[in-house]
């Protein structure tokens, strides 16, 4: 080394140097025998100075022949060197640099040793900042350390970069240069990141190609050791990092030779070590800081010479000689460009072309950017240069110019002879914008022009500021002669990219050809567009731009030919291969005319293959990659066919061997079939194609953004968009993915209406919101396409029609919905044939108004009727993340703000131009923003604080406006209501529009109103959500998240836990479970999963929940609770990911989620601080026990299986430890559940376990009510779902009460199925002899399988020897008080049998507060379910006036939608005179206006007059239940009355007497005058008026706009002789024409079949109504010319003369041939009573024909008493007419029930 490179060390320090040398192992006083190198400063007593270390000479003879060819990408080329010359690496994933760290981790896991014979220690950190800190620490300890990063990751390293450079520590950071997030995030290439660290003191060395990535990495590692200056080695992200090229690489032995002797030892000697201690990183004051800073100058002064010297030293080893500045071009060039990175090779090609054309041009290609050597730069410039264009791949908005431009300009100013050279700057290639030779030619044209554009841009059209230079796309060919080019268009996850990577390596590693491959992707995570650009040739290929003149193009997805101009890039006579199902005739219709013209005019050889069909036959499904690859090798001739076939088969073993022999065999079979057969088949191109005329064009949407920006983006034409169409700042409209219509699914779900139970599970789990429930009116159904089949809607949508509809062109075909459906109501069908039909259906469905407001949006089922405001995202098929966020938008979307961390959710949720977040019909929807990866919690926190502050301001203004009454009375009332609800859920949404409308009209009245109107967007209670993945929450963003959760701020955090960094390719995070194999943990993760939720719970004031798709109801509940909590909340959702490698595929995502819960792998729990304030345990464990096999669960995921293949013993050990950890964690949660608030054992010593099986929550609610009753009777109680117990524990439970519902056709609820399965297994006789039990079933007695599950459990427990305490009880949904009626009749027997003492009652705490507010304005109140209906006729009696029974018909005018068979619910009002009489007796003034503050869920008016409240709302004339009497006894002052009330409450004889006398609430208050609850309690104790339901006798098709009722005005005489009439009957009996009442539609079991099927109808009395409706409907259809099936009606009533209802109409149907009628009038002949069931027996042949042979349907409507006899009669008919046995006849009846052909409506 030249002496000038380092100053000579002063003699004063020589002794210290010698002394220091002995410390590192040299012999003191011995003369050096080898070359002397300078490295690093030596510690002295007060200051570090440089010194020399002498080491023995070693064999460093270059051997360039040791190099080997290998086809690698830039990342692998770099990692090869970095791994060899490092001993530690600290890594963190960030695209596009992650691959470098992944490879280092792979090699470490494989035990590969570096050049020094040691396995590199590769450690993943929590962030790039952590990686830099660890790097600094390792260097301080003397390690040879490195890291890999990009973009924001590099910026996070800046503080430590200053430290490392300041302390003169040798190191290399390898950077895949990438853009920084500014107006938008871009993962693509640019120099913004590296330019942001140019001031840190690190040397910066740039690679331009894949080969240089290897070489410059080597030069960096050598030069840093020689100079003690750390290096940033960078190359262009993606374009170089991910380009595959065949390059020469040095083996480790050769790399080791290049390590300067003694430099590593010198570095070690400077380490922090107690054997030679120093102090580093001190605090310096003003007296010495400046000087110490300047003391390092000597290390930088000649650093450029050190680098050049290193390049010279490396050259003999690699055969490639580099310069820090390389000049190419004419020696007398006048125009020169200066640039670095991958664009350099493109400019080089352009220079060669221009020089051949006689142009005097050249280029300076920069390698060493920092330190910038002015001398070296000036030296390479030709003396003839007149103009220079400095090209930067970054933009610095506020600077005079970009960095390279400034450096060039400053350099030339230092040389007088160069000061006349004109320098301009330009930008190119930002965000990996393809930089092609034509762009380079345009730059030279601009440079040579008279007035060149300064600070120009190239590759874009800047029509705003005019910076862009024009270029002509002349398709110049600058490639080496003999280069062949290919493009493969694929669909994400079809294997195309992987196959092409394999193909390049096959060709590169098995031939003399050089190879290059580059891969392009769109924004979709999976199922997106991929294009693979491959080149092959005899000479090295450095063209770093996309293929534009291809010899071979393959399109692996047929729809692409309609979207992409892919043949624009094919040369004349090239080969085109299409995977399609089309015949030549189909192609005429399907392939656009311009595409066909290209085929013909360019004389393209066109081949077609139906790859999917062929691969299906081999069992490969959509994985068509190997078939298409075989076609390529067969047609391209790149390799000899036999060799290509052999190599392909070998590559299959390598690629798929780990997936099993079967997969290998299938892929090899399909490859061999291609080589052996006539695949693909050449298409004989019709001559007419050359002149094909466009017959159709894409229909514009009329939305400018979609037509002008989004569609070009999707069609890969974004490069053509000008600057003027962009919005400065990077904002984009929402709801654009609905226009994408990618149509990527080969199969889509088809709805099977007959099987559907309308649970909406399919909609919940759909990752892309492509399958949804729709509710329609009859009128809407009539307008629907013929294929738009519906069925009768249930629940809140009574009277309407239900359909599950898929969006066929948005569906990804993931099959999650099909696999999740519990009723087999979905099946996958061929998309090719189904899409045309379903497209029409979808287009119709989405135009139907959303009716989500008609149901409870905060329930599982109800949430799915809400419009998803996240739809058609770019997430992978089967994604486990999107359903959570979709649910969030359905629950709170129209008032939600989302701060989204960078990661998967920001890519599928925030890709420019393709926004899946959308709006409702009002234009409201989630506002979404992304800051960075590391700061998302703080970003969201800032939004929350700002919105809270703004809302507080608007609240202050509204408070003043209300106090000052500046608005009219109506608006003031609304604003006052807003003040009450302003921070409570979505209550304000109900009247928000009214407020805004009122403000718009009145804002000119007062400045306060003007201010409020100006802040109207703050009126909603904004729901703030912070969303991100587990890597963000547990690692890089944990510090911020922890602070935000600790802040107490009201906001919500949702962590989408895939247990790895999914977005960057599946690297381990701290959320990754032990034993899992992930990138950066290929040897299996050896530490426990971080428990983020427990950390959050430790604060005590954070709502915390874990959720999973395996328990959808719990998930919905947790979301609702979290959002309602006034404070920070944290929800962590288990999100299955494609990176998990589910053996059954992502279609089974929900089942695997269920298994995760069952095995304890993912426990479900909620921590609600509000419960602690109530004295309850805030911790709620929702998965009560471990009940699955953990090992089986793990064995279904490749991430756990792969470790066992590589390290069986290690895998078993880690999995065993994980199982122990999971068990220990679960036991800890059990202890938390039993925590300090758990009651001690009951004093009585009695204990009961209450178990429930619940689907909708009824059984669970009843179980918890029962638990309270047992606790009051001094029992200790445990309440659990049946599936949460271990069945083996039953024998030790002592006493068990089971409450269980029946679902569907006799099915167990989901949370009891495992219990029943286990209980059915073989057990020892008398196994449960020590168990006492009782069972209560919930069901609907009109169903054949009424309480079937309860009966099964009861019988099974008895068979196992358990002792039945009391007989099974039944709760009938059809009873007036639903299941409570049966429960209240059953439970006393339990208390009696147990001999429990009657507990002391405690008065409940009311959920309402009541105030007298005389100045308030009363509100008009209607129940949510009600709609005004107008009586057209009043009540028209149809039985004689003197007859005792009064049947009436009523015609109603209404817009309510209903179906034949539905009932009309009528909301009665109490008689005003009776109410006023009661109020006067009670001492209440009916005119008083009261305000009710309602904290519960009950529907009550906010402000109302007392008289109206008791008339319209409270059921004061209803029948009290036994609990009412208990409560009333608290208020009884008179002792005798109190005792009597308590006696009645025990449900003894007096209670029965009261029931028989039909006493109502008003009666009871008269009977007990000393019991006077306050108005507050009175309202609590008296329930709301319920609608009474009456069968509808009309059909919408017959009398549209009308509903007809057939009603029996029911009156009766009580035992005491009192005359009673029902409340509603009283109102209807006196109904007048034109009178309006509140009504609603209620669905019944009467769901009628296809009109061509026969039906049998049995009616008693007014039960005739639905059958009249059915007859009217079929009669109308027949008149329309439609075919209808046979109809038989069996009608029963008392007397023919007076009660033959609708006689004339029924006779008319008989005469029309529509109806067979049989009537049974039971009291006409007292001696011989005839009933309906008797008449059925007489028609045995007709019954057998209609119901068994023709599979018709049976309907019964009327009294419950005739239901069973009719069934028996049917069985009789089947046996007699069909010759069936009794068992066979029974099975036929059962089949009718289970297939929905037997319907009952009984009372």
From Swiss-Prot:
Signals that turn on the gene: Expressed in both aerobic and anaerobic conditions.
Gene designation: PNO
UniProt cross-references to Gene3D superfamilies, sorted A to Z: 3.30.70.20, 3.40.50.360, 3.40.50.920, 3.40.50.970, NADPH-cytochrome p450 Reductase, Chain A, domain 3 (1.20.990.10), Nucleotide-binding domain of ferredoxin-NADP reductase (FNR) module (3.40.50.80), Pyruvate-ferredoxin oxidoreductase, PFOR, domain III (3.40.920.10), Pyruvate-flavodoxin oxidoreductase, EKR domain (4.10.780.10)
pH dependence per the UniProt record: Optimum pH is 7.5.
Positions that bind [4Fe-4S] cluster 2: 811, 814, 817, 821
Catalytic activity: pyruvate + NADP(+) + CoA = acetyl-CoA + CO2 + NADPH
GO molecular function per UniProt: 4 iron, 4 sulfur cluster binding; FMN binding; iron ion binding; oxidoreductase activity; pyruvate dehydrogenase (NADP+) activity
Function according to Swiss-Prot or TrEMBL: Pyruvate dehydrogenase [NADP(+)] is one of three enzymes participating in respiratory metabolism. The enzyme is also active with 2-oxobutyrate and oxaloacetate. The enzyme is oxygen sensitive.
Main location, first listed in the record: mitochondrion
GO BP annotation list: cellular respiration; electron transport chain; pyruvate metabolic process; response to oxidative stress
Domain named 4Fe-4S ferredoxin-type: residues: 747-776, 802-831
Residue numbers binding [4Fe-4S] cluster 1: 756, 759, 762, 766
Binding site for FAD: 1458-1469, 1585-1595
EC number: 1.2.1.51
Keyword annotations of the record: 4Fe-4S, Electron transport, FAD, Flavoprotein, FMN, Iron, Iron-sulfur, Metal-binding, Mitochondrion, NADP, Oxidoreductase, Repeat, Thiamine pyrophosphate, Transit peptide, Transport
UniProt name for this protein: Pyruvate dehydrogenase [NADP(+)], mitochondrial
Disulfide bond sites: none
């Amino acid at each position: 080394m030249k002496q000038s490179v380092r100053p000579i060390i002063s003699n004063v320090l020589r002794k210290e140097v010698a002394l220091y040398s002995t410390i590192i192992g040299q012999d003191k006083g011995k003369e050096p025998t080898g070359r002397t190198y300078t490295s690093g400063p030596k510690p002295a007593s007060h200051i570090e100075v440089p010194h020399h270390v002498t080491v023995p000479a070693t064999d460093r003879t270059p051997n360039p022949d040791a190099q080997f060819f290998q086809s690698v990408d830039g990342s692998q080329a770099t990692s090869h060197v970095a791994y060899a010359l490092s001993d530690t690496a600290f890594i963190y994933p960030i695209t596009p640099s992650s691959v470098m760290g992944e490879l280092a981790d792979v090699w470490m896991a494989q035990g590969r040793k570096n050049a020094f014979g040691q396995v590199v220690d590769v450690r993943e950190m929590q962030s790039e900042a952590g990686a830099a800190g660890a790097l600094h620490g390792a260097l301080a300890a003397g390690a040879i350390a490195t890291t890999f990063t990009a973009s924001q990751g590099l910026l996070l390293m800046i503080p430590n970069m200053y430290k490392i450079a300041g302390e003169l520590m040798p190191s290399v950071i390898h950077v895949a240069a990438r853009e920084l997030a500014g107006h938008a995030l871009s993962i693509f290439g640019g120099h913004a990141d590296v330019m942001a660290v140019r001031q840190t003191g690190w040397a910066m060395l740039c690679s331009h190609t894949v080969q240089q990535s290897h070489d410059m990495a080597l030069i960096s590692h050598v030069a840093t050791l020689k100079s003690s200056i750390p290096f940033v080695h960078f190359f262009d992200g993606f374009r170089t990092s991910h380009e595959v090229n065949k390059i020469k690489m040095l083996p480790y032995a050769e790399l080791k030779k290049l390590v300067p002797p003694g430099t590593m030892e010198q570095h070690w000697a400077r380490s922090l070590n107690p054997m030679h201690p120093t102090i580093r990183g001190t605090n310096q004051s003003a007296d010495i800081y400046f000087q110490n800073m300047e003391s390092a100058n000597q290390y930088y002064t000649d650093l450029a010479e050190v680098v050049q010297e290193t390049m010279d030293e490396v050259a003999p080893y690699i055969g490639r000689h580099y310069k820090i500045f390389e000049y190419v071009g004419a020696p007398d060039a006048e125009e020169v460009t200066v640039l670095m990175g991958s664009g350099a090779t493109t400019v080089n090609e352009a220079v060669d072309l221009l020089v051949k054309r006689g142009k005097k041009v050249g280029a300076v290609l920069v390698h060493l950017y920092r330190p910038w050597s002015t001398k070296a730069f000036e030296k390479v410039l030709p003396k003839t240069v007149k103009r220079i264009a400095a090209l930067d791949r970054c933009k610095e908005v506020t600077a005079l110019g970009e960095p390279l431009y400034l450096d060039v300009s400053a350099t030339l100013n230092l040389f007088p002879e160069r000061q006349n050279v004109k320098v301009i700057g330009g930008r190119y290639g930002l965000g990996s914008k393809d930089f092609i030779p034509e762009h380079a030619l345009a730059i030279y044209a601009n440079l040579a022009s008279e007035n060149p554009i300064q600070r120009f841009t190239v590759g874009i059209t800047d029509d705003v500021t005019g910076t862009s230079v024009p270029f002509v796309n002349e398709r110049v060919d600058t490639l080496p002669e003999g280069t062949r080019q290919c493009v493969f268009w694929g669909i994400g996850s079809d294997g195309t990219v992987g196959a092409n990577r394999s193909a390049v390596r096959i060709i590169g590693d098995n031939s003399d050809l050089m190879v290059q491959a580059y891969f392009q992707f769109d924004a979709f995570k999976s199922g997106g567009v991929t294009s693979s650009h491959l080149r092959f040739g005899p000479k090295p290929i450095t063209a770093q731009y996309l293929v534009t003149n291809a010899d071979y193009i393959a399109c692996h997805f047929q729809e692409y030919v309609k979207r992409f101009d892919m043949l624009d890039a094919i040369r004349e006579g090239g080969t085109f291969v299409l995977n399609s199902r089309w015949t030549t005739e189909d192609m005429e219709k399907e392939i656009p005319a311009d595409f066909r013209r290209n085929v013909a005019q360019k004389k393209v050889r066109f081949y077609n293959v139906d790859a999917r069909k062929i691969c299906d036959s081999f069992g490969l499904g959509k994985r068509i990659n190997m078939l298409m690859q075989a076609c390529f090798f067969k047609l391209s001739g790149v390799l000899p066919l036999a060799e290509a076939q052999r190599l392909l088969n070998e590559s299959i073993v390598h690629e798929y061997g780990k997936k099993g022999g079967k997969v290998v065999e299938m892929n090899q079979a399909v490859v061999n079939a291609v080589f052996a057969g006539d695949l693909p088949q050449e298409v004989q191109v019709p001559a007419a194609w050359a002149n094909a005329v466009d017959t159709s064009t894409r229909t514009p949407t009329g939305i400018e953004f979609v037509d002008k920006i989004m569609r070009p983006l999707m069609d890969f034409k974004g490069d053509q968009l000008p600057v003027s169409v962009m919005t400065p700042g990077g904002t984009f409209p929402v709801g654009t993915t609905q226009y994408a219509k990618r149509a990527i699914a080969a199969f889509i779900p088809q709805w099977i209406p007959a099987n559907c139970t309308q649970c909406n599970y399919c909609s919940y789990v759909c990752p892309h919101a492509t399958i949804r429930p729709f509710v329609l009116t009859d009128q809407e159904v009539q307008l629907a396409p013929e294929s738009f089949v519906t069925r009768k809607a249930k629940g809140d949508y009574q009277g309407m029609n239900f359909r599950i509809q898929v969006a066929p062109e948005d569906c990804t075909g993931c099959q999650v919905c099909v696999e999740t459906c519990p009723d087999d109501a979905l099946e996958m069908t061929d998309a090719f044939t189904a899409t045309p039909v379903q497209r029409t259906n979808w287009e119709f469905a989405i135009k139907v108004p959303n009716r989500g407001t008609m149901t409870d949006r905060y329930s599982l089922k109800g949430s799915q009727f809400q419009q998803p405001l996240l739809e058609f995202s770019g997430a992978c098929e089967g994604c486990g993340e999107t359903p959570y966020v979709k649910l969030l938008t359905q629950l709170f979307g129209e008032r939600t703000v989302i701060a989204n961390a960078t990661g998967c959710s920001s890519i599928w949720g925030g890709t420019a131009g393709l926004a899946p977040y959308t709006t409702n019909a009002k234009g409201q929807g989630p506002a979404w923003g992304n800051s960075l990866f590391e700061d998302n919690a703080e970003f969201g926190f800032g939004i929350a604080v700002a919105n809270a502050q703004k809302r507080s301001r608007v609240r202050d203004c509204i408070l003043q406006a209300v106090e000052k009454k500046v608005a009219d009375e109506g608006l003031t009332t609304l604003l006052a209501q807003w003040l009450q609800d302003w921070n409570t859920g979505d209550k304000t949404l109900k009247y928000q529009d009214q407020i805004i409308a009122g403000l718009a009209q009145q804002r000119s009245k007062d400045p306060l109103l003007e201010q409020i109107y100006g802040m109207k967007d703050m009126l909603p209670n904004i729901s703030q959500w912070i969303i991100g993945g587990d890597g963000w929450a547990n690692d890089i963003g944990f510090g911020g998240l922890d602070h935000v959760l600790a802040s107490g701020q009201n906001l919500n955090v949702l962590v989408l836990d895939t247990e790895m960094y999914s977005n960057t390719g599946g690297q381990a995070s701290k959320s990754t479970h032990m034993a899992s194999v992930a990138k950066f943990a290929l040897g299996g993760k050896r530490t426990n999963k971080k428990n983020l939720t427990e950390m959050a719970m430790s604060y005590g004031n954070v709502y915390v929940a874990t959720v999973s798709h395996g328990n959808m109801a719990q998930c919905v509940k947790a979301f609702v609770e979290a959002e309602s909590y006034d404070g920070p909340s944290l929800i962590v959702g288990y999100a299955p990911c494609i990176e998990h490698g589910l053996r059954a595929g992502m279609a089974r995502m929900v089942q695997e989620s269920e298994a995760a819960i069952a095995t304890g792998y993912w426990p479900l729990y909620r921590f609600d601080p509000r419960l602690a304030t109530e004295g309850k345990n805030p911790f709620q464990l929702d998965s009560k026990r471990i009940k699955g096999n953990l090992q089986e669960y793990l064995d279904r995921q490749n991430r756990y299986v792969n470790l066992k293949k590589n390290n069986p013993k290690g895998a078993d050990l880690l999995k065993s430890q994980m199982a122990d950890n999971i068990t220990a964690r679960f036991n800890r949660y059990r202890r938390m559940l039993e925590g300090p608030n758990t009651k001690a054992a009951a004093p009585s010593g009695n204990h009961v376990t209450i178990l429930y099986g619940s689907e909708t929550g009824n059984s669970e609610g009843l179980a918890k009510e029962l638990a309270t009753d047992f606790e009051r009777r001094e029992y200790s109680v445990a309440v659990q779902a049946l599936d949460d117990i271990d069945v083996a524990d039953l024998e030790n439970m002592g006493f068990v009460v089971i409450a269980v519902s029946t679902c569907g056709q006799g099915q167990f609820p989901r949370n009891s199925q495992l219990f029943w399965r286990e209980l059915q297994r073989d057990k020892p006789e008398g196994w449960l002899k020590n168990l006492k039990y009782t069972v209560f079933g919930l069901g609907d007695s009109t169903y054949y399988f009424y309480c079937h599950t309860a009966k099964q459990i009861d019988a099974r427990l008895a068979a196992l020897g358990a002792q039945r305490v009391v007989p099974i009880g039944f709760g009938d949904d059809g009873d007036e008080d639903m299941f409570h009626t049966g429960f209240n009749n059953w439970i006393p027997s339990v208390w009696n049998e147990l001999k429990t003492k009657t507990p002391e009652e405690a008065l409940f705490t009311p959920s309402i507060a009541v105030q007298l507010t005389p100045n308030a304005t009363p509100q008009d109140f209607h129940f949510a379910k009600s709609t005004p209906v107008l009586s057209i006729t009043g009540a028209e009696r149809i039985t004689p006036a003197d007859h005792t029974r009064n049947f009436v018909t009523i015609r109603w005018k209404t817009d309510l939608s209903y179906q034949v068979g539905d009932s009309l619910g009528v909301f009665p009002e109490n008689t005003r005179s009776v109410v006023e009489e009661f109020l006067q007796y009670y001492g209440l003034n009916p005119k008083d206006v009261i305000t009710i503050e309602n904290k519960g869920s009950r529907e009550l008016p906010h402000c109302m007059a007392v008289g109206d409240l008791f008339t319209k709302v409270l059921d004061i004339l209803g029948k009290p239940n036994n609990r009412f009497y208990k409560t009333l006894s608290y208020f009884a002052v008179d002792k005798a009355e109190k005792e009597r009330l308590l006696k009645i409450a025990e449900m003894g004889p007096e209670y029965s007497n009261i029931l028989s006398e039909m006493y109502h609430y008003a009666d009871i208050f008269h009977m007990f005058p000393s019991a006077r609850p306050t108005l507050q309690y009175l309202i609590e104790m008296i329930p709301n008026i319920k609608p009474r339901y009456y069968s509808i006798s009309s059909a919408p098709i017959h009398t549209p706009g009308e509903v007809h009722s057939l009603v029996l005005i029911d009156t009766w005489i009580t035992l005491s002789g009192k005359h009673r009439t029902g409340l509603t009957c009283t109102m209807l009996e006196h109904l007048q024409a034109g009178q309006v009442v509140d009504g609603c539609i209620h669905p019944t079991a009467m769901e009628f079949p296809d009109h061509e099927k026969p039906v049998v109808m049995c009616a008693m009395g007014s039960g005739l109504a639905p059958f009249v409706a059915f007859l009217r409907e079929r009669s109308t259809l027949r008149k329309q010319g439609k075919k209808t099936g046979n109809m038989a009606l069996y009608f029963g009533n008392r007397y023919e003369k007076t009660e033959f209802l609708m006689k004339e109409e029924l006779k008319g149907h008989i005469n029309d041939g529509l109806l067979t009628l049989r009537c049974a009038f039971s009291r006409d002949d007292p001696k011989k009573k005839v009933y309906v069931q008797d008449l059925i027996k007489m028609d045995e042949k007709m019954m057998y024909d209609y119901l068994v042979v023709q599979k018709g349907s049976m309907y019964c409507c009327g009294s419950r008493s005739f239901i069973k006899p009719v069934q028996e009669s049917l069985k009789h008919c089947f046996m007699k007419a069909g010759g069936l046995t009794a068992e066979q006849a029974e099975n036929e009846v059962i089949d009718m029930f289970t297939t929905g052909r037997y319907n009952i409506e009984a009372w």
